[in-house]
A protein has these predicted regions:
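PEST-like, low-complexity acidic/proline-rich intrinsically disordered segments
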Residues: 1-11, 401-402, 423
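Soluble acyl-CoA-dependent acyltransferase catalytic core bearing the H(X)4D motif
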Residues: 2-5, 19-26, 39-40, 44-347
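N-terminal low-complexity acidic/Ser/Pro-rich tracts
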Residues: 10, 14, 20-22
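Detector for long, low-complexity, acidic/polar
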Residues: 29-30, 34
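Short, surface-exposed beta-strand/loop micro-motifs that present aromatic residues
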Residues: 36, 144-150, 372-380
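Short, low-complexity polar/charged micro-motifs in intrinsically disordered terminal tails
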Residues: 100, 421-422
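Short, intrinsically disordered/low-complexity patches at protein termini
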Residues: 182, 192-194, 411-414, 422-424
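Low-complexity, glycine/alanine/valine/leucine- and proline-rich hydrophobic stretches
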Residues: 330-417, 424
Length: 426
């Protein structure tokens, strides 16, 4: 059987609930106006660690020589970090006007201990819906955060987390992970979270002049959405992970003009892919990459200002208490609507995670499949300059992304990620 294609079984060994060492009772944390834009739903993130060695454990405060001792260390550190990140140990409730709030009641975080009959090198990273979902990530989620720690046959470990996206985004969750790892290594925490919602308060402004018209296009109150036609068949998006070499990123920037950021150049490249997958927008197909990058910059610039985000806070305030959804994720029941949409995340890299037995060999986010929207999440690597890209897109876009010549290299297994012999593909 080819490496990266192995099917495997997972056995749950135990389920424990880890509570903070200092309890918080009855405190309610309201959602900010930005938080109210996020619909209920869980996101996942997982970290793969090689089997510990004396070299990788040299900075550990105790001997992480066995899986049980590592799990015990994770639990002990988790109970401490939840004192600082106490909302993650709570649960969502509804307030008197129907909006979600976090009840900080110290219910704790479920931690699952499991065993998987597979080696780390055999994991099919390219297709995480098969190799990761419901295997290395918690399948049943209680509260805001659930964690699964899985021992692999080779002695490697995967720490999988599933969390309610309304409570935390990728950046703040990485703050939590970094703090958890610091405590595990008896190191001081670098960043302390702030729960001061007044920093994100809307301006004193009347609803009639509180919003830029662009927000009415980007977001939609759920009550405005048409009812879904049950006879309409919408294809599910697929999850894939790709590798892009630093050489290809540099080549994109060269073709797009060095005045543009790498993220703008990457977005311009993706625009042309979307145009190709839709078999239309000929003007975009005929444009040079540098010209498309200029257009991306023109559209992006207004959305990177302080006024833009202040205006968004005002827009949400004017529409409270109506549930709101990003238009890109609003399923459409019009069979004739064949538009293609895609969004790109911030493209920032995050700190390496080390609980005391070495840095994670690989990590990625994971999201349940949906039927409309789609996005690309580029994750620049701090040491090599290479990118890992998590993609949740339609099958037609996958075909366009992988059509040669392309910068997207399917990440079939960990060997592709760890190899230093990658070559430029563009």
């Amino acid at each position: 059987m080819a490496s990266g294609s192995k099917k495997y079984e997972v056995k749950i060994r135990s389920v424990d609930t880890v509570i903070p060492v200092v309890l918080v009772q009855g405190h309610r944390l309201p959602q900010s106006n930005f938080d109210l834009l996020v619909p209920p739903g869980y996101s996942g993130i997982y970290f793969c660690f090689h089997k510990p060695t004396p070299r990788t454990c040299k900075d550990a405060s105790v001997g992480f020589t066995t899986f049980p001792t590592m799990v015990a260390a994770l639990k002990a550190a988790l109970s401490k970090v939840l004192v600082i990140y106490y909302p993650l140990a709570g649960e969502f409730v509804t307030n008197s006007v129907g909006e979600a709030e976090i009840l900080c009641n110290s219910r704790g975080v479920d931690l699952i201990e499991a065993y998987a009959d597979v080696e780390l090198r055999e994991l099919n990273l390219y297709n995480p819906s098969v190799s990761v979902e419901a295997k290395l990530l918690p399948e049943k989620i209680n509260g805001i955060l659930s964690i699964q720690v899985t021992e692999l046959r080779c002695g490697a470990m995967v720490v999988g987390c599933a969390f309610d996206h309304r409570a935390t985004d990728a950046y703040s969750f990485f703050m939590f992970m970094s703090a958890w790892a610091d405590i595990s290594r008896n190191m001081p925490i670098n960043q302390i979270p702030s729960y001061c919602r007044s920093l994100l308060s809307p301006r004193i402004i009347s609803p009639s002049n509180s919003s830029d018209p662009i927000f009415d296009q980007i977001f939609t109150p759920l009550s405005f959405l048409p009812s879904v036609n049950p006879k309409t068949s919408l294809e599910y998006l697929v999850n894939h992970i790709y590798y892009i070499s630093a050489a290809d990123i540099a080549r994109l920037q060269e073709l797009s003009g060095h005045s543009h950021s790498k993220l703008v150049c990457f977005t311009a490249y993706c625009w042309k892919i979307l145009a190709r997958s839709a078999c239309r927008v000929k003007a975009l197909l005929d444009m040079k990459l540098s010209e498309v990058a200029d257009e991306v910059e023109k559209w992006l610039s207004p959305a990177t200002t302080e006024d833009h985000f202040l205006g968004l806070l005002d827009w949400v305030e004017a529409h409270r208490t109506k549930p709101i959804l990003s238009t890109i994720f609003a399923a459409d029941n019009k069979e004739e609507d064949k538009s293609v949409s895609c969004m790109v995340s911030s493209g920032r890299w995050f700190a390496e995670i080390d609980f005391g037995w070495g840095n994670a060999a690989f990590w990625s986010s994971h999201f349940p499949r949906r039927q409309k929207g789609g996005f690309l999440m580029p994750i620049p690597q701090p040491t090599t300059g290479d990118w890992i890209v998590y993609a949740q897109v339609a099958p037609s876009i996958v075909a366009a992304m992988e059509q040669e010549p392309t910068i997207f290299c399917p990440l079939r297994n960990l060997a592709v990620y760890e190899s230093n012999s990658s070559r430029a593909r563009l």
